[in-house]
Amino acid sequence: MTTKYVYWGEAKVKLTWKCEQQLPPRERITSVHGFCFKADKLLLVNVTPRGWDFPGGHIEHEETPEECLKREAYEEGYVTGSCSLLGYIIVDHNENPNWDERSPYPKLGYQVFYRMDIDQLHDFKAKHESLERILVNPSVVTKYHHKWNELYQEILDYALVLK
């Protein structure tokens, strides 16, 4: 497990990666993300306004986390594939004096991560948030991703082991 403190605006938030094969409580999952691979290449999508990123986003009301990733991977990268759960980042606002009970996010929430093995690269249409997609060698992801950090690196390293 790796822990990192970050500032989201003025808010100090504790993030902890947990490699886990069971999902956290559904009502506390705020987003789902995926490291998506075609052969040995990692999919990155250029998402407005974030820049280069891995596919992911907020979970919708009736979705399972895996369904969320599959939807986001298709909307952002026009890919489909099979998924394996990697674990989750615990998003802890307990040390955040700006957190408020009316927040749309729980005081203790989760960002779930999957590995997707891409079965099909569909025609890229750029109809959603993404401007483009690329497949890169995972060793160069830091040259593209807008906010790469040690948590993402630990998750990627684990995803690469699951080949």
What residues fall within each predicted segment?
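Acidic, metal-coordinating catalytic segment for phosphate/diphosphate chemistry
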Residues: 1-33
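Conserved Nudix-box catalytic region and its N-terminal flanking loop in Nudix hydrolases
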Residues: 37-75, 79
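Short helix-loop capping/hinge motifs at secondary-structure junctions, enriched
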Residues: 42, 120-125
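Active-site-adjacent beta-strand/loop module that shapes the phosphate/pyrophosphate-binding cleft
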Residues: 81, 91-122
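NUDIX/MutT-family hydrolases
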Residues: 112-115, 124-155
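Charge-rich, low-complexity intrinsically disordered segments
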Residues: 153-163
